[in-house]
């Protein structure tokens, strides 16, 4: 399923987001030995913030062109079309998350750290995140 397909599914059925976010929050509050050490999701920083969890909340920021290049590398396609599709997806997601939860994923309020990853490769992003986790 592509990002666009998933976005369309979520737009048509808000229950998809509600169920996924409920599962995500369940995992975030676990304290057993099998609890996840790292959780990645567009809203995980928000949920950790709203749940009052004392944990690093990291937002990876990338510019529109770099985001499109990464999608292109993963899924193929025309770069200009991907830029347009990403903008449309972001607009739809903003409307959906505002309707569901009254928040926008890209608002930086809940995040303890923001990494501009536009000029970083995957290994550099990982190193930056590990540095934050080791210091926390």
Question: What annotation goes with each model-predicted range?
Answer:
Residues 46, 78-128:
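Small-molecule kinase domains that catalyze NTP-dependent phosphoryl transfer to phosphate-bearing small molecules
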Residues 1-50, 64-65, 76-78, 91:
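ATP-dependent small-molecule kinase phosphotransfer cores
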Residues 34, 54, 109-112:
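Short, well-ordered alpha-helix to beta-strand connector turns
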Residues 17-25, 122-133:
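Short, amphipathic alpha-helical "lid/cap" segments that border enzyme active or binding sites
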Residues 31, 74, 93, 97-100, ...:
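Solvent-exposed amphipathic alpha-helical surface segments
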Residues 8, 12, 55, 113, ...:
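Conserved short-loop catalytic and cofactor-binding motifs
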Residues 52-89:
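Conserved phosphate-donor/acceptor-positioning beta-strand/loop module used by diverse small-molecule
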């Amino acid at each position: 399923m592509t990002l666009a397909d998933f976005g369309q599914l979520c737009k048509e059925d808000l229950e998809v987001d509600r169920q996924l976010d409920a599962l995500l929050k369940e995992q975030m509050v676990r304290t057993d030995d099998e609890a996840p050490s790292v959780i990645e999701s567009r809203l995980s920083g928000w949920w950790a913030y709203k749940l009052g969890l004392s944990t690093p909340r990291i937002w990876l920021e990338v510019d529109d062109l770099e985001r499109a290049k990464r999608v292109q590398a993963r899924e193929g396609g025309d770069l200009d079309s991907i830029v347009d599709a990403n903008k449309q997806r972001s607009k739809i997601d903003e409307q959906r998350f505002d309707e569901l939860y009254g928040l926008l994923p890209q608002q930086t309020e809940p995040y303890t750290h923001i990494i501009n990853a536009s000029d970083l490769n995957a290994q550099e992003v990982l190193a930056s995140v590990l540095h934050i986790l080791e210091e926390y």
